């Protein structure tokens, strides 16, 4: 293992007392345990396992992580995890010495028991891991050089959001949520996304190659001007592949539920002209329309609903044209996959992790 010498207690652990540093180690791991994080194995040797995770940087991690100096990576946290079992620590069979290196500048050293949860199939190199029986311990005077690690360049698997979602009804507390986009809600109590999805049969009349079935993405394609503004064009820059632990948007990022009509996301405008692909109008309305009105005002009322007509109607001059209500249904993305989507999206991290639930 290639290493470089660092005096960890002073240069990478804030200049606190040993007692404070111990607390920082444990608190950092506690912050990790508050999330569903995917760890991808980089190396698995007889005496060393090296794993990597990529997550969005939110307010709860700012105390423990120095932002990456590269602009593209400044909003993310890259965590290397080194697992060993030094004989001098007399660890129990399931315990490990764990060294975390966050963004290459902060080191945290603990002993802990790992609880590993494969989420797709046995033998995958990507797993959810939680840590229990956590105790702070001395870090090594020589720590690994993360720049020498071979990082993955290909995904473990291409994720399809439609494989994981479940058709459902609104939860018992439909108002205890926040709007993520048009027809997309984050439920505080259920810790998952609910959204309106197009019936699969309607894909046959969509433009060639169109596969996204969420109402928010469909409306964005229908309404947004085709050239797109800077924010629209930079969608991929706001995402990483948190499941495959890759510095790229990935299939989950391309289908992220943060997509939506540009002028609603930026200015909360509710009367929107159709400036995009008008051929998608046939899956939304029973006839062609040139404008769309959003029903719900997120500043006064938010409610998870299974009815398309509760979310959008035809705009001014087209009020007699009904929506295609039979073509849409409510689905939810299970908690674990909702969490993974949040970890890979800057906007969802801000909306879901840094917001307090409504009082109901």
Swiss-Prot record:
Keyword tags: Host cytoplasm, Host nucleus, Late protein, Virion, Virion tegument
Subcellular localization: Virion tegument; Host cytoplasm; Host nucleus
Main location: virion
A single Gene Ontology CC term: viral tegument
Domain of life: Viruses
Coiled-coil zones: none
InterPro entries: Herpes_UL16/UL94 (IPR004286)
Sequence similarity: Belongs to the herpesviridae cytoplasmic envelopment protein 2 family.
Function in brief: Plays a critical role in cytoplasmic virus egress. Participates in the final step of tegumentation and envelope acquisition within the host cytoplasm by directly interacting with the capsid. Upon virion binding to target cell, a signaling cascade is triggered to disrupt the interaction with the capsid, thereby preparing capsid uncoating.
Assembly information from the UniProt record: Interacts with cytoplasmic envelopment protein 3 and with the capsid.
Record protein name field: Cytoplasmic envelopment protein 2
Originating species: Gallid herpesvirus 2 (strain Chicken/Md5/ATCC VR-987) (GaHV-2)
């Amino acid at each position: 293992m290639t290493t470089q010498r660092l005096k960890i207690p002073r240069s990478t652990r804030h200049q606190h007392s040993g007692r404070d540093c111990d607390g920082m180690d444990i608190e950092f791991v506690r912050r990790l345990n508050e999330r569903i994080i995917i760890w991808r194995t980089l190396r698995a040797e007889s005496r060393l396992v090296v794993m990597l995770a990529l997550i969005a940087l939110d307010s709860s991690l700012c105390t423990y992580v120095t932002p990456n100096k590269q602009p593209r990576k400044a909003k993310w946290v890259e965590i290397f995890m080194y697992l060993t079992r030094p004989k001098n620590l007399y660890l129990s069979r399931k315990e490990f010495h764990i060294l975390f290196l966050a963004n290459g500048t902060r080191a945290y050293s603990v002993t802990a028991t790992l609880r590993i949860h494969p989420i797709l199939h046995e033998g995958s190199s990507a797993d959810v891991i939680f840590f229990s029986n956590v105790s702070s311990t001395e870090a090594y005077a020589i720590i690994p050089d993360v720049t020498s690690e071979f990082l993955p360049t290909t995904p473990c698997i291409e994720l399809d959001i439609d494989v994981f979602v479940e058709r459902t009804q609104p939860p018992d507390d439909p108002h205890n949520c926040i709007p993520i986009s048009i027809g997309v809600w984050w439920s505080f109590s259920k810790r998952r996304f609910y959204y309106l999805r197009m019936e699969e049969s309607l894909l046959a009349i969509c433009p060639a190659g169109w596969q996204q079935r969420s109402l928010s993405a469909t409306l964005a394609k229908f309404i947004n001007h085709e050239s797109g503004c800077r924010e629209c064009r930079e969608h991929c820059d706001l995402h990483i592949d948190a499941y495959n632990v890759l510095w790229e948007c990935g299939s989950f990022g391309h289908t992220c539920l943060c997509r939506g009509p540009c002028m609603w996301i930026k200015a909360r405008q509710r009367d929107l002209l159709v400036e995009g692909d008008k051929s998608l109008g046939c899956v939304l309305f029973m006839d062609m329309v040139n404008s769309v009105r959003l029903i719900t005002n997120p500043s006064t009322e938010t409610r998870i609903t299974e009815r398309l007509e509760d979310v959008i109607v035809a705009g001014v001059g087209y009020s007699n044209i009904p929506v295609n209500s039979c073509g849409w249904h409510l689905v939810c993305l299970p908690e674990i996959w909702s969490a993974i989507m949040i970890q890979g999206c800057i906007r969802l991290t801000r909306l879901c992790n840094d917001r307090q639930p409504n009082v109901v």
